[in-house]
Amino acid sequence: MRVLILVNERSGRGKAALLGAGVETALRQQGGEVLALRAAEATLEAIRAWGPRAIVVCGGDGTVHHLVQQAFGQGLEQWTVYHAPTGTENLFAREFGMWPRVLPDEIARRVLRDQSRLIDLGIAGERSFALMMSVGFDAAVVERVCAIRTGRITRWSYAKPILREATRPTLARMRVRIDGERIVDAHRGLLVVGNVRQYAARLNPTCNADPSDGLLDVTFMAASSAMEIIRWSALCWSRAQHAAVGCVMARGHEIEIESLEHEAAVQMDGESAGRLIPGKPGVIRVAPASMRVVQVSPRRA
């Protein structure tokens, strides 16, 4: 089997490079044909030229997101993806049972076993996401982090942006429709569109999402202050958000989001993804069975 290894050398203070080298050795020892590339230099043309059956991504969620951006609609579903996590949150790996500290020999066995499943993706204009997108406080924090980022990030990288955003939280007044039905009408709050259950700090606002059901899960939490954001964080942590006043949870094929007053930051898979412009609704659609991942184990929270 031909396997491509994509390595984000900035991830994990060099851990991704070490892990990638170990996986390359293990794959060769187990009979695989292997090509290793730096993720930053791996063009779609280079991937196609190698013609891999599987791709091992050594890095964080951003590295997986970059691959999805490159290859959605260009043959992504033909390659079985395994995430060898060395990032900050590693939500993709967590969702699909690709846990950290798995030895290179075991990663090689999982990949060469050639057992996979198809998952959905979310599409918003020219961008796509595997995990989630959101509008609100968290997206504004991500935007702040990306604006000052100079290298790898850790959880501490978010501390100052969170504090600064909390002093004057960006909570847009939104209108939201799912498959044509209005579920939020001119309320301020946080909106998450999830393809999977996982979210940063295990808050998991779309805790019932299934990445293979052909639908996207939506959670809206009404909020107009930093204290209400803290309250929602606590409710999500305890998996009690669904029963709280001000929470709307639904799912569908197409979600339309409109910011009514001012520009609102958007994030996808933990990466800044521009802004919603008043008067220009954003439309998010599900793309069923658009990505293939290594089948490891049943999902766990």
Please describe what each predicted stretch is.
Residues M1-C58, H65, Q69-Q70, E106-A108, ...:
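ATP/NTP phosphate-donor binding region
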Residues L4-V7, A21, Q30, L35-R38, ...:
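Catalytic core of DAGKc-family lipid kinases
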Residues A16, H66-Q69, F92-R94, R202-L203, ...:
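Short glycine-/acidic-enriched loop or helix-start segments at secondary-structure transitions
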Residues T170-A172, H187-G189, S212-D217, R251-H253:
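A generic structural signal for short beta-strands and their flanking turns/coil linkers
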